[in-house]
């Protein structure tokens, strides 16, 4: 343990990650700043992950049934003794200085409670072009957000124990978007940071169908969560207008204008492409929206070309178009479903002033 830093407990939730679990744990023990404990929480794996963890120098917690990553993280946090909790997914191998760099950020920024890492540009195991695409995009997306952030992601993240306890842990009803939802309950006094110095190599999804299924599922969850965040923000405004004490949770995070623009361009391209069957010259409409899409994400595409060349860039652009299209579809479905649920649950707002005693 490096002197002057708080104690760290590493929490590794795992479910059917026999392929990468050992690499994940060994990477933790190669850290220049050693944690006081490493806790692996097995979420009722069926592929031998539990047996692998039992043979590693870590504390193993076994959940009796599969309960999701939220429950696994909460179980690990409940057993941890460190002043800082470092959550790392079991398909990530941390760089040797990852924990030390996260602690340095916490020390340099006393108001910061959450330090989120980024993915390395190279995957932990390159199993095909789908994985290379996703890894490159995730690396670029996170690296561009180095500094103060407004949302929480917990694939490789350090958080002060006090802040975690103030939030009350992860919502165990959620199996997707649980980390984003966690951040909506984080008191506004706590700063969130993304650090490009906290790096891990990620073994991501490597087949097209699972990639699309995962992306749609998460997009639906994000869309539904967005409704809840907007409703909560509206209630805070009502409280302030009524003279009530405002809630301490942070307000709704800012909109990623670039991502929204890219999604809309992709949707417009897909929806207007059939116009070419009416008249050939109408192909200019989807061509224009597709060109706009490439301009919106131009910096990303130039980054990919520098690393992988023009041939892979063509594949990357096609995958990115598909990703944005499915993401918008999923978020639309999730938002609509969340809006319906919110409308059903929301009580009618009284227009009559409450009586007051004399």
Question: Model regions: which residues?
Answer:
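A conserved acidic beta->alpha catalytic loop
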Residues: 27, 34, 42-50, 65, ...
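Short, well-formed alpha-helical segments that are part of the catalytic scaffolds
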Residues: 17-30
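Glycine-rich, basic loop-to-helix element that forms the pyrophosphate-binding segment
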Residues: 63-80, 101, 154
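Acidic donor-binding/catalytic loop of UDP-sugar-dependent glycosyltransferases
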Residues: 48, 92-105, 184
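Short aromatic/hydrophobic "clamp" motif used to bind/position activated sugar donors
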Residues: 85
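Catalytic donor/gating beta->alpha subdomain of glycosyltransferases that bind UDP-sugars
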Residues: 173, 180-247
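Conserved donor NDP-sugar-binding/catalytic core segment of glycosyltransferases
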Residues: 97-129, 203
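Short, flexible, basic/aromatic active-site loop/helix in glycosyltransferases
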Residues: 116-119, 131-150
């Amino acid at each position: 343990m490096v002197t002057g830093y708080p104690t760290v407990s590493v929490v590794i939730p795992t479910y059917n990650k026999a392929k990468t679990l050992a690499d994940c744990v060994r990477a933790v023990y190669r850290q220049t700043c050693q944690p006081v404990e490493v806790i692996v929480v097995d979420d009722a794996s069926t592929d031998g992950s539990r047996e692998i963890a039992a043979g590693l120098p870590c504390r193993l917690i076994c959940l009796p049934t599969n309960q999701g990553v939220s429950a696994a993280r909460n179980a690990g946090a409940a057993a941890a003794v460190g002043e800082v909790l470092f959550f790392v997914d079991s398909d990530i191998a941390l760089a040797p200085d990852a924990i030390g760099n996260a602690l340095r950020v916490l020390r340099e920024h006393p108001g910061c409670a959450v330090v989120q890492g980024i993915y390395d540009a190279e995957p932990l195991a390159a199993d095909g072009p789908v994985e290379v695409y996703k890894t490159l995009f995730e690396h670029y997306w996170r690296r561009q957000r180095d500094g103060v952030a407004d949302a929480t992601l917990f694939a490789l993240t350090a958080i002060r124990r006090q802040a975690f306890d103030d939030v009350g842990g992860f919502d165990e009803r959620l199996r997707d978007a649980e980390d984003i939802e966690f951040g909506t309950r984080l008191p506004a006094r706590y700063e969130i940071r993304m650090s490009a110095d906290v790096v891990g190599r990620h073994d991501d999804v490597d087949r097209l169908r699972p990639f699309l299924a995962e992306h749609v599922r998460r997009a639906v969850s994000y869309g539904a969560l967005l409704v809840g965040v907007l409703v909560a923000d509206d209630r805070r405004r009502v409280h302030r207008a009524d003279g009530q004490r405002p809630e301490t949770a942070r307000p709704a995070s800012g909109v990623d204008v670039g991502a929204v623009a890219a999604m809309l361009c992709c949707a417009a391209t897909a929806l207007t492409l059939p116009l070419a069957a009416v008249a050939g010259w109408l192909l200019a409409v989807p061509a224009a929206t597709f060109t706009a899409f490439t301009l919106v994400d131009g910096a990303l595409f130039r980054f990919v070309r520098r690393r992988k060349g023009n041939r892979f860039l063509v594949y990357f652009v096609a995958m990115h178009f598909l990703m944005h299209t499915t993401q918008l579809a999923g978020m639309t479905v999730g938002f609509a479903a969340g809006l319906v649920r919110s409308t059903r649950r929301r009580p009618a707002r009284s227009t009559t002033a409450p009586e007051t005693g004399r």
